[in-house]
Curated annotation (Swiss-Prot):
Name of the molecule in the record: Interleukin-1 receptor-associated kinase 1-binding protein 1 homolog
Classification via InterPro entries: IRAK1BP1, SIMPL/DUF541
Family: Belongs to the IRAK1BP1 family.
A GO biological process held by the record: immune response
Chief location category: cytoplasm
Role played: May be part of a signaling pathway that leads to NF-kappa-B activation.
Length: 249
């Protein structure tokens, strides 16, 4: 989690329109806030920024399984590839893969006296442990005409959307905590939020290989496909005097 260091400026006289400002905000942004709050001239406010950073691991793994064979008779080559495809599909279903996460592609061609058939199965696993179990079964049980590829880890649209919401909400919570602590120091009470605005957001993903360029092992490879997101939120809170215990400056 990333926090931005800041100091809070305070107008000490309790006149209308007092504003407690976070030093991090730009002059341009200050002008925008003052304009926004001009209609609430009797409201004292405190303005802060809050930052957050969250990383999310992949939630899906795609495995490509290819089958190829060549025979003089078209029925023979078709039957040979089909039997292996059926075993691959059965194995995927036994490891809780739904039909919508399985894609099968076939290609048949003739080269002089031989018929060549190729097929590819793309399987999307949501359970990484079962993915490894399924790969092990296929590698052990099928011959060299079947090639089981390495898993490719990725993030679903749903997990990315959740990541963006989480980092935004955490940045707002950090801003609220910062404002609350500043109010305690100043002998004031934190009121309701008057303005919330996201000032910056970024996302980035890690490399799938280490610095030396060599392939990573299974667990580091999963970690290496992390997607990280940061958010910086600007929040304006109403500032209220503490009941029965207002500090004198």
């Amino acid at each position: 989690m990333a926090h931005s260091p800041s100091r809070v400026f305070a107008a000490l006289s309790p006149s209308a329109g007092d504003v407690y400002r976070d030093e991090n905000q730009s002059v341009f942004n200050r002008g925008r806030k003052q304009t926004h709050l001009s209609a609430q001239s009797n409201v004292r406010v405190i303005e802060v920024t809050g930052c957050a950073e969250i990383s999310s691991p992949p939630d899906r793994a795609c495995v490509s399984i290819s089958v190829k064979n060549s025979k003089e008779n078209v029925n023979d080559v078709t039957n040979s590839v089909t039997r292996r495809l059926e075993y691959i599909l059965q194995t995927a279903r036994q490891h809780d893969v739904k039909e919508e996460n399985i894609t099968v592609t076939k290609h048949l061609q003739r080269d002089e006296d031989l018929f060549h058939m190729q097929a590819e199965v793309l399987v999307v696993f949501l359970d990484f442990e079962k993915m490894q179990q399924a790969r092990t079964v296929l590698i052990e049980k099928l011959d060299k005409s079947v090639c089981v590829g390495d898993p490719y880890y990725s993030h679903s649209a749903e997990s990315l959307s959740l990541l963006r919401r989480r980092v935004c909400l955490e940045a707002v919570d950090n801003a609220r905590l910062k404002a609350s602590e500043a109010c305690c120091t100043l002998g004031q009470a934190l009121g309701r939020p008057l303005l919330v605005r996201e000032e910056e957001s970024r996302e980035w993903s890690s490399s799938q290989q280490d610095a030396s360029g060599s392939p990573l092992t299974l667990h580091p490879r999963t970690d290496a496909t992390l997607i990280s997101a940061t958010s910086r939120m600007f929040v304006t809170f109403e500032l209220r005097p503490k009941d029965n215990n207002r500090r004198k400056f």
